[in-house]
Amino acid sequence: MQKPQSIPILRALHTACVVVGLLASQMSHAQVAPSQAEVAGYRGLHAAAARGDVAKIERLVATKADLNVRDAYGRTPLHVATFAKQNGAVRALIQAGADKSALENDRYDAVTIAAVADDEETLRTLLSLGASAKLMTSRYDGTALIAAAHLGHDGVVRQLIAAGAPLDHVNNLHWTATIEAIVLGNGGPRHQATLRALVDAGANLQLTDRHGKTPLALARSYGYAEMVQMLEKR
């Protein structure tokens, strides 16, 4: 018979295995940036977006080029410019009328692409030009905020919160941004700052994962003392 003190250890190991499995699943559906071969084969607006060639974008726009043309992976020129961190191209495309909410094949929009890349400058440009922080994106029915919280991109998280991102959206893994900051984070300074931003913004700390665990219970189970202290004060 197992000793009683071994049960919490087994539970922790089970939780860790579940998270590892979910991480592997998420990686299989991660964002796919254009490959070097794809970029080399681009023409028109896709090529100009990848290079950040604003003058070429403006010339093509003047000829009525399709601003939302898709590559083989469903990426528009705006997606490509965002992946390439070509801030000037992002601005030029949006100002010309590009669809700010377009989703590529894995259902990512430009805002979520910038959030995952921790690209605060491009994100700031997108949001200032009217791109939404509220879209449901990815195959996990998540949001840019959930993706950024998962990765501990605290500056991005603060921008998204300021832009009205839904704090308590629950994805199809039954996780909120707050929960992902804990269970998919490492408990380090950036994930702590992410959690702090969410808590200070008023995230609902009573929402649970599909096993009924609150953020506080999850932080305790992972041994994240700083996060536990933060959550206990609420």
Task: Locate the predicted segments by residue.
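Intrinsically disordered, low-complexity regulatory segments in ankyrin-centric signaling systems
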Residues: 2, 28-63, 72-75, 95, ...
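Start-of-repeat signature of ankyrin repeats
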Residues: 41, 74, 107, 140-141, ...
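Ankyrin repeat A-helix N-terminal signature
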Residues: 47-52, 80-86, 113-119, 147-153, ...
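Ankyrin-repeat inter-repeat connecting loop/turn
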Residues: 67, 100, 133-134, 167, ...
